[in-house]
Amino acid sequence: MYPDRGLLFLRLQATEPTLREESRFNFFITFGGVTPLSEVETFCRTGHDSVLESSVFLVTLHVMITPDDIFRIADGAAFDAAALEIFRRQARECAPYREYLARIGVRTEHVDTPEKIPYLPIELFKTHTVYCGETPPEAVFTSSATTGMTPSRHPMRSLALYERTFRAAFRTFYGEPGQWSLYALLPNYLRRKGSSLVYMADRLIADCGSGGFYLDDCEGLLAAMERDPKPKILLGVSYALWDLAERYAPKLRDTVVMETGGMKGYREEIPKEEFHRILCDAFGVGEIHSEYGMAELTSQAYSQGGNVFRCPGWMRVTARDVNDPFDPLPAGARGGLNIADLASWWSCAFIQTQ
């Protein structure tokens, strides 16, 4: 058996003399008593067609993974295998994704490498319920939307899976939450319902054991941070951090400043490098960290400086031509983003952003 190669040689007893050279079967087997496998296709039978004669079959394994398995992804090969299995399931169970694949003429059985997986346009989260199965979701997260715009909706079947995802990502880049205090300056997110960012920050603040949300009380925020002896993370929406920098220019001690969410129409958009320089000068820090997430995703990517983002092992981001969603670009090129987020287990793990 070669599970790392996805191949398995079986010696089977032929019971029908009419078996052809190219026979195809389905098996449900347990590999090593641990990994459930599904839809094992057999082909390339060798030997002679005779009753009870021992024959050799080469079979391809499609591993049926569980949500637990995505957190054990350790390399690119494991990611590729998991991505293909999740694609096959979501192509069957997620109606908008299934319809999209049909409209663009993609047949599931022809998608045999991750590079061939089509990515669902993110706009469909505004017009369709991107969800697998019939079980009601535990929550529905929504995106920010200006007046007159339709927000995206992301049904979350399992809040436990979402919590496990953001906690695992946080530990990957920042270690155990208990060593930090987390202060959240997220005014526009707190003023509306359905924010996945607020949900995440609330749970991480509880895990840290210190910190909190500050809506408009900037003086209270700065006083609390000044008294706090622990290392601190100040997580703020970009425009709110800029306001804090202009009004108070506080020199923050033992603090990671982490921006997220953009200007949301409250401030002018400026190049990220210039914005980070303004914050560094005002707060007296050497680098600005960033969190990248969105309502349509389950996972987060983090930059720990230099605006270079890193993803957890179950998330992958690639660039594509903005005018051709099926034309990938090389690493380092500028373009639209294709995001594979394997933690989006019950919605769609393959999202095409603008």
Predicted ranges, named:
Residues 147, 162, 166-205:
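Internal, well-ordered alpha/beta segment that forms a basic, Gly-enriched binding/recognition surface
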Residues 92-142, 148-155, 162-178:
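Active-site diphosphate/adenylate-binding microenvironment
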Residues 2-13:
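Extreme N-terminal basic, low-complexity initiation segments
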Residues 2-4, 26, 49:
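Intrinsic-disorder-associated, low-complexity terminal segments enriched in Asp/Asn/His/Tyr and depleted
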Residues 15-17, 23-24, 34-37, 48-52:
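Short, low-complexity intrinsically disordered segments enriched in A/P/G/S/L with frequent Arg
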